[in-house]
């Protein structure tokens, strides 16, 4: 029995665990490149400003859904894969909306939004081009792609 206890860690030592925490390379200002994006809502303007810590994603979002209707919101949530109360998103008015962020790898994360415990939206964010491009692919509750947004990192 003692032999099995000693050898088991060696046997499974090759297994790699998924990255945890938030992605520090996301920190900075990201501007929507509407020419490269596929967005049926025709979002003309969106800027994300990330200031992540090791365990918490923090960002300021400025956006314009309609001409002359620019808005912003600021929020933070742990990157632990658990549901947390969601900020007052303009597109979500449910009092018990939640958001969960799970890091998938060194340069990617998965975000889940729910209202009343039911899935509403998911999106995957991936850093590319030497961390100078962020790709966001959004899906609805039926897993249908609803946007592909490309953001360029401001220098």
Residue ranges and their predicted role:
Residues 6-8:
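Sec-dependent N-terminal signal peptides
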Residues 1-4:
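Positively charged n-region of N-terminal signal peptides that target proteins for export
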Residues 13-15:
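N-terminal signal peptide c-region/cleavage motif recognized by signal peptidases
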Residues 19-155:
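Hydrophobic small-molecule pocket/channel-lining residues, especially in calycin-type beta-barrels
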């Amino acid at each position: 029995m003692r032999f099995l206890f000693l050898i088991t860690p060696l046997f499974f030592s090759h297994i790699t665990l998924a990255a945890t925490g938030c992605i520090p390379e996301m920190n900075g200002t990201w501007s929507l490149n509407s020419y490269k994006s596929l967005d049926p809502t025709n979002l003309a303007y969106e800027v994300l400003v990330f200031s992540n810590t090791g365990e918490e994603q923090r960002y300021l979002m400025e956006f314009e859904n309609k001409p002359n209707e620019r808005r912003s919101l600021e929020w933070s949530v742990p990157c632990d894969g658990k549901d947390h109360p969601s900020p007052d998103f303009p597109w979500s008015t449910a009092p018990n909306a939640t958001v969960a962020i799970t890091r998938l790898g060194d340069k990617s994360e998965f975000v889940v939004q729910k209202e009343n415990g039911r899935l509403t939206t998911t999106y995957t964010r991936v850093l590319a081009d030497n961390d100078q491009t962020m790709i966001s692919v959004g899906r609805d509750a039926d897993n249908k792609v609803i946007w592909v947004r490309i953001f360029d990192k401001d220098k």
